[in-house]
Amino acid sequence: MNEELVDRIVREVREALALKAGGGEGLHNGNAIPLGVSNRHIHLTRGTFEKLFGAGAAFEEMRSLYQPGEFASKHTLTIIGPKQRPISGVRILGPLRNYDQVEITLTDAITLGINPPVVNSGTLDDAAPLTLVGPAGSVYLPKCAIIASRHIHMTSGDAARFGVQEGDYCKIRVGGIKSTLFENVLVRINDNWLLQAHLDTDDANAANIRSETHVEFIGKM
């Protein structure tokens, strides 16, 4: 069995398990997308990681995440904004990247006293400043904090099925007692990804999302 076929089977099995775990109340399976809820987290470069944890420090994996090759590390930091009200225990996700980024919610931003933009991950031109504190030192990053846009990870095959392209915006619906329609959900396409929608904890709490579930794809904006 070739590697490409194995990858496809693994992708389909994981998506099916996520769909089963999420139930199916009021949704049509053909339009169902597994949902992941993103808590605040950090992406770092190797250089910044070593400033915070020490020269030559090992970047250690704790557990795998849903998307292939991505993982939660064993390492956490404290983040501090102008209000000097720190948020501790913010986990670093791997692998290490070529830019430093802190993804937070609006609730976090109010606590920290900053006004980060709502943008796609990696868009840092207007990002807000924060100080990161680790066991070996601290680093001030003038442009690092964002609120990540609602988005869906898709393969090109998924995109064709839903009739969307990279960079399109769409609508998704969450069922349940606090059924919610989310608009301005960004489409991101990469054939190495598994199909999954991402909301942050503010959005998830507003819709009373308590566990793994799935959303219904409604259509393009």
Region spans (language model):
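Protein-protein interaction and targeting regions used for scaffolding, dimerization, and localization
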Residues: 1-31
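Electrostatic, structured charged patches in enzyme active sites and in nucleic-acid/phosphate-binding
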Residues: 221
